[in-house]
Regions:
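Conserved catalytic-core segment of nucleotide-activated headgroup transferases in glycan assembly
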Residues: 28, 187, 214, 222-314
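Donor nucleotide-sugar binding/catalytic pocket of nucleotide-sugar-dependent glycosyltransferases
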Residues: 150-151, 158, 180-188, 192-233
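Acidic donor-binding loop of glycosyltransferase active sites
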Residues: 199, 299, 310-327, 338-341
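Short hydrophobic beta-strand element within catalytic cores of glycosyltransferases
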Residues: 331-334, 341-345, 361
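Conserved acidic donor-binding segment of nucleotide-sugar-dependent glycosyltransferases
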Residues: 360-367, 375-380
Length: 415
């Protein structure tokens, strides 16, 4: 129990700087930080394996202490370092596949953990919240002294990496396929070792919750959905003869890179075959060179946008042709909240409480995607109905306000 008159102390271990908007992982971290800060003195331990981020003001207003664990070579696991230095490509690949832990765990060494405790001001916290299973080893020194330990599993890394392996194989990238398959297998072992050390596991959807229960019977699991801000009013650009397509995402994340390349390389050319004008905007953080190279006539790459609202206001359709991944897509929820009709793959919409033809249109290949896009473009009533139903669903189930209530109830055990 927390002594009377003292706010409980919480440690949030995050792979990215929390934020109110932008990157989906940063937004989820931001939701956790916001909920924790309401009732706790929060120490944020940033282990920036997913990037540092640029929302320091949002974070500083909510934390008691901000500690960053530098990911430096002197704290790198020597076993990983040895394999990474091999020059022969086959030996290099074999060593990375044989490394026993998931790759993001490679800095979780004794020197790094000692530095983490020092940076956090000690190892005792009433509540410890860890975002992503691969950060669990970095929280090891803090678990024994905590009375309430939560692990957020918003992305199903095993599933994501398995799907990535299949995607790489289809694209003729056997080395990347082998490495992704090896990483997926490592996560299976990693989960068995680390998940039982937490009092409560959190999933982003009922689909992932069921998968966790099946893999790890007896462990406590709850759902914390991804959420977005719902604006009071929705502004849309006037209709145009040009079909305006939008894709939003972290453009350094492989499933999003694959989606952007597919839209520009397959979908847009198919839609333009009849001579109709089509414009595409790809907006997101940290675009890889192959994404930047997509820019051309009618295709705009918007790198690191500070505000996505103008892009959603411009768009006729938001696309989510995701072919790999294991969480729920905040990009779809943002489009719903902005009143933009969505066309997605079944994997893209996986885990969301939505129905094909009621909240969005689902499609699997370029033919089906093109047909769905033209259906919405040619039927304003269909687009309006999908957008209205989707906005209602966000308000009912995925608003930031409702998400905060869910989180605060789960976090209140130590308060």
């Amino acid at each position: 129990m927390t002594p009377k008159g003292r706010r409980p102390a919480a440690l949030l271990v995050s792979p990215i700087l929390p934020a109110a908007g932008g990157n989906g992982l940063a937004m989820r971290a931001g939701a956790f930080l916001d909920a924790l800060a309401a009732d706790h003195d929060v120490t944020l331990l940033l282990v920036p394996v997913a990037g540092g981020g640029d929302s320091a003001d949002f974070t500083r207003r909510r934390v008691h202490r901000l500690a960053t664990l530098p990911l430096e070579n002197d704290s790198l696991d020597p076993l990983y370092s040895l394999g990474a230095r091999l020059l022969d490509p086959a030996e290099h690949l074999a060593a990375l596949r044989a490394y026993p832990r998931p790759a993001p765990c490679r800095w979780a060494t004794s020197p790094a953990l000692e530095a983490a405790v020092a940076a956090a001001g000690g190892a005792r916290f009433d509540t410890v919240v860890v975002l992503r299973s691969y950060l669990a080893p970095y929280a090891a020194p803090f678990l024994a002294g905590s009375s309430w330990r939560l692990l957020d599993l918003d992305d199903d890394e095993r599933l994501t990496l398995g799907r990535l392996s299949e995607l790489y194989a289809r694209r003729g990238q056997p080395e990347r396929a082998l490495l992704a398959a090896a990483e997926a297998a490592k996560y299976a072992v990693h989960e068995r070792a680390w998940l039982p050390r937490f009092d409560l596991l959190l999933a982003a959807s009922e689909v992932h919750e069921a998968a966790i229960r099946e893999r790890h019977p007896g462990l406590a699991v709850s759902v914390v959905p991804n959420t977005v801000e719902v604006p009071e009013t929705v502004r849309r650009a006037p209709r145009s003869p040009t079909l305006r397509l939008l894709f939003v995402g972290n453009l350094g994340y492989e499933p999003n890179v694959d989606a952007a390349l597919w839209i520009a390389g397959e979908l847009v050319p198919r839609l333009r075959r009849d001579g109709s004008p089509v414009e595409l905007r790809v907006a997101g953080s940290h675009p890889l060179p192959e994404v930047v190279a997509l820019a051309g006539p009618g295709i705009t790459i918007c790198a690191d946008p500070t505000d996505l609202a103008p892009h959603y206001a411009w768009a006729d359709l938001a696309l989510a042709p995701i072919r790999a991944g294991g969480g729920t897509r905040i990009k779809i929820l943002e489009a719903f909240a902005a009143g933009v009709p969505v066309v997605a793959t079944p994997i893209g919409a996986e885990g969301l409480a939505v129905q094909d033809g009621e909240h969005l249109l689902l499609a699997d290949d370029s033919n089906d995607f093109a047909t769905a896009c033209r259906r919405i473009q040619g039927d304003s009533l269909l687009g309006a109905r999908l957008a209205a139903n989707a906005l209602d669903r966000v308000r009912e189930s995925y608003s930031r306000v409702k998400g905060k209530v869910i989180l605060q109830k789960l976090l209140s055990r130590s308060a």
